[in-house]
Curated annotation (Swiss-Prot):
One of its GO terms (cellular component) is cytoplasm. Protein of unknown function; part of the gene cluster that mediates the biosynthesis of siderophore ferrichrome A which is contributing to organismal virulence. This is Fe-regulated protein 8. InterPro entries: FAD/NAD-bd_sf, FAD/NAD-binding_dom. GO terms for molecular function: electron-transferring-flavoprotein dehydrogenase activity; flavin adenine dinucleotide binding. The gene is fer8. Keywords: Virulence. It comes from Mycosarcoma maydis. It comes from the Eukaryota. Induction: Expression regulated by iron through the urbs1 transcription factor. The keyword Protein biosynthesis does not apply.
C-alpha cells in the first residue's frame, strides 16, 4: 500500500481523532508518544471528562460516588512531553466527515457563536463508539437533555436523577439480560432489598448469551436468591408498550408492568458519519485486518464502531484495536506512505467481569476460566482509572 503524504514543507500534518473514550484515548497516547515533530493530534470530543461507563450502572443506583466516574482529560497528551502544547483537544460536536476532501466539520459546544468550523486531516481515527442504552447514556433520557453540555456537573446531575427515579419506584422492570441489565438488577435488589419488586426480562433463554452457560447459571441463581423475577425467552412486543413505558407484553403473551422500566437493550454503532456504503448490515464499519476503513485507507476505525472480526464490545478490545491502529499510522508516517506490511488485529476470546450486587462478581477470562470473585469496593475501584492516567485523587471534583 502506498499513501501520498506529500505536503508543503511549512504545513503541519494532522491526525484527527474523533472520540476520546476508551479506544480513542489509548490511540491518542500511543500516537503522541512517537509522532514526528511536524505532526500533531487534534481530538474532537463532546464530553469534557472521560466517562467511565463500566461503573455507570452502579453509580445510577448507589449514591455518593458519582464524581469518580467523570475523569479529567488533563494528562491526555502527557506522553508527548515537551511537545504537548502542539496537540489540541476540542470540546465539540462532530457534524460531517468529508472523506474526499479529507476534512471534518464541528461546532464548539462552549462557543456556538463561532459557528461551524472545518479541520483538515491527513489520517483520521474514528472512535465514536456506539449509541448507548438510555440507562447509561448521559446524552439521553434526561430532563436536561436539550441543554446538556457534556460537562462533569451535568453528568453528575444525570446520575443523581437516575438514582432518584430508581429510589422513588416501588416496582422496576429491566429489559435486557446482558451485563448492563444484570448489574442494574442485582445492584437495585441488594441496595433496596424486598422494598422493591424487580423484574428482569430477556429475549433469549440464556442471560449473558455471548459467554459460557456457566455465567448464565450463576447469574440466574444469584438473581433468584435476591428475589428478582425472571421472564426469559421472549421479546418485548413493541406494539404493546404504553405511552409512559410502564406496561407492555412479551410476544408470548406475558404482561409486565412497573413504576419504572429500564430498557437495557443493545448498543447501536455510531457510524452514520462514515456513509452507508462503508457499513455492514448491522451498521458497523467495514474494516480491513489493519483496522483501516475498507473504503478509505486513511481512516482507521476502532472500538464499538468497527466490525472487528467478531471482537466483543469492551474496553480491553478497544484498547487492543487502538494500539494496532496507532502503530499502523506511525508506521505509514515513518515509511513516508510507501507500500509496507502493516500490523493486523486479531480478536481475543470473549472475556468479562460482571458484578452481581455490591460484593459479588463472576468472571470469564480469555483463557476460558470461570470464577466467582469479590467485586471490589462499592465504587468498583473507579479511582484506579484516575491513578492509571497519572491523576491525583485528592480532589475528585476536578
Amino acid at each position: 500500500m502506498t499513501i501520498d503524504l506529500s505536503l508543503k514543507s511549512n504545513q503541519q500534518k494532522t491526525i484527527a481523532v474523533l472520540g476520546a473514550s476508551y479506544a480513542g484515548h489509548r490511540a491518542i497516547q500511543v500516537l503522541v508518544a512517537s509522532l514526528p515533530e511536524d505532526w500533531r493530534v487534534v481530538v474532537l470530543e463532546r464530553n469534557t471528562h472521560a466517562n467511565h461507563l463500566y461503573a455507570f450502572p452502579r453509580m445510577s443506583v448507589v449514591r455518593g460516588h458519582e464524581q469518580k466516574v467523570f475523569i479529567p482529560y488533563t494528562n491526555m497528551f502527557k506522553p508527548a512531553l515537551d511537545r504537548r502544547d502542539q496537540h489540541v483537544l476540542l470540546h465539540a460536536n462532530v457534524l460531517e466527515l468529508d472523506q474526499e476532501q479529507r476534512r471534518v466539520s464541528y461546532e464548539l459546544i462552549d462557543d456556538k457563536q463561532s459557528g461551524v468550523q472545518w479541520l483538515h486531516w491527513d489520517f483520521l481515527v474514528y472512535a465514536l463508539g456506539s449509541h448507548l442504552p438510555d440507562p447509561i447514556n448521559v446524552w439521553s433520557n434526561s430532563e436536561h437533555v436539550n441543554t446538556h453540555d457534556g460537562s462533569k456537573m451535568m453528568g453528575v446531575k444525570w446520575l443523581r436523577d437516575a438514582q432518584d427515579r430508581i429510589e422513588k419506584a416501588e416496582s422496576i422492570v429491566i429489559v435486557g439480560g446482558g451485563a448492563l441489565g444484570v448489574q442494574l438488577a442485582t445492584d437495585i435488589a441488594v441496595t433496596y432489598g424486598s422494598s422493591k419488586k424487580v423484574t428482569l426480562t430477556h429475549s433469549r433463554p440464556q442471560l449473558l448469551p455471548r459467554f459460557d452457560p456457566w455465567m448464565h447459571e450463576k447469574t440466574a441463581a444469584r438473581l433468584q436468591e435476591l428475589g428478582v423475577e425472571l421472564a426469559l425467552g421472549s421479546r418485548v412486543d413493541l406494539s404493546t408498550v404504553s405511552e409512559d413505558k410502564k406496561r407492555f407484553k412479551l410476544l408470548d403473551g406475558r404482561e409486565l408492568q412497573g413504576d419504572l422500566t429500564l430498557f437495557c437493550l443493545g448498543q447501536t454503532p455510531n457510524t452514520s458519519l462514515l456513509g452507508a456504503s462503508s457499513l455492514n448490515d448491522s451498521g458497523m464499519a467495514k474494516v480491513e485486518p489493519t483496522l483501516q476503513l475498507s473504503a478509505n485507507e486513511r481512516i482507521f476505525v476502532i472500538g464499538d464502531a468497527a466490525d472487528a472480526f467478531g471482537a466483543i464490545n469492551a474496553g480491553h478490545t478497544a484498547w487492543d484495536q487502538a494500539e494496532v491502529a496507532a502503530k499502523n499510522i506511525l508506521a505509514l508516517i515513518d515509511n513516508k506512505g510507501q507500500a509496507m506490511k502493516l500490523e493486523e488485529y486479531k480478536p481475543t476470546p470473549p472475556a468479562i467481569k460482571v458484578s452481581l450486587g455490591i460484593d459479588r462478581a463472576i468472571r470469564q477470562t480469555m483463557a476460558g476460566e470461570l470464577v466467582e470473585v469479590d467485586s471490589g469496593s462499592i465504587d468498583l475501584n473507579s479511582t484506579n482509572m484516575w491513578t492509571r492516567r497519572g491523576l491525583s485523587t485528592d480532589d475528585l471534583w476536578q
